[in-house]
Structure formats: structure tokens, C-alpha cells
Amino acid sequence: MRGVILMAAALIASCSEAQKSAAEQERDDEKAIAEVEAAQTPPPDVVTPQRITDEERARYQLSDSGCAFAVNNPELGAQAILQMNVGYMKFDGAMERFAPDAGAGDGPAGTSTRYDGGRHGLIVSFHQAEAAKAAGDAVSVPTRITLQDGRKRTVYVAEGTSLCG
């Protein structure tokens, strides 16, 4: 008998709990979804581009056409090679290939202002109004590159110079 009374009391107590409004339930659901998504999102892939050597330029058949970007002294080796049909950067000793984005703007020497790679996207801002004549037919263009991971998070930004020709 005592058990029946306890069960009846528990049943009555559970009936007296207020139901959540639709707005409260939606807010709780959105919060739970955001918590799950935050737990599944990996941290950004922090990268530091390395200089591309003359041997790598030869191995990947990168011509002198297009632009070679470097933070300082592009003559010593570029951190990005940007051409009409391809772009390359080097991370952790491995070359990453980029394809020009067909919908992007045009840069100097037939380059693009956006390139897409397997792991990263590259946004290139050429300051062509500040371009200066360099050796031969080359032009020195102040440039900013922004590297993004696959989730469009910025993982690297640098100001430097592009030698274009």
C-alpha cells in the first residue's frame, strides 16, 4: 500500500511540472546544437609558408612568368608563386598546389586575386597603384596575401612584395 501511495505522489508531482514554451524549447535546442558543433570544429591549422627553392621551381616546372611573392627579398626565394593557371606555396617542406578561382579578379602578369588549394584558399591583394619598375621587364608590386583554411578561417596574413613579369 505504501508503494502505491509513493507512486501516486510521484505521478502527481510529475504532472505539475510546467511545459516549456515553443520559444524556450527552440532556444534550448539551438544552444545544444551550437555546443555539439563547437565540440566538432577542429582548431585552425596554423601554417608558416617557406621559401620555394630554385630546385623546386624546376621540379614543378614553374616559369618566371606571373608573380613571385615574398615577405622580404623576393630575389632570395618566394613564399608564393602565382601564375595564370597555377599557384604554389610550401608548408612543412611540402608544396601545395593552388588553382586560380575563375570568378576572381585579375592581378598583374596574368595572375588571379584568388586561388583555391586542397587544404587552403589564398586571397591576394595587389596594390598596383604603388607598382614600381624592377630589373628587366619585371614590376615590383606591394602585395598582401591572406591564407584561409577549409572553414574560411584566416590562418596566415603577410605583407610583402611581388615581382611580376
Task: Describe the role of every protein-language-model region.
Residues P108-R151:
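Acidic, glycine-rich flexible loop segments
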Residues T154-G165:
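Short, low-complexity, Pro/Ser/Thr/Gly-rich segments in the mature regions of secreted, periplasmic
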Residues M1-A13:
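Sec-dependent bacterial lipoprotein signal peptides
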Residues K20-A104:
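An ectodomain-focused feature that recognizes extracytoplasmic/extracellular
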Residues M84, V139-T143, V157:
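Short, surface-exposed coil-to-beta transition loops
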Residues E96-F98, G121-L122, V155:
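Short, isolated positions in well-ordered beta-strands
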Residues C15-A18:
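Bacterial signal peptide processing site
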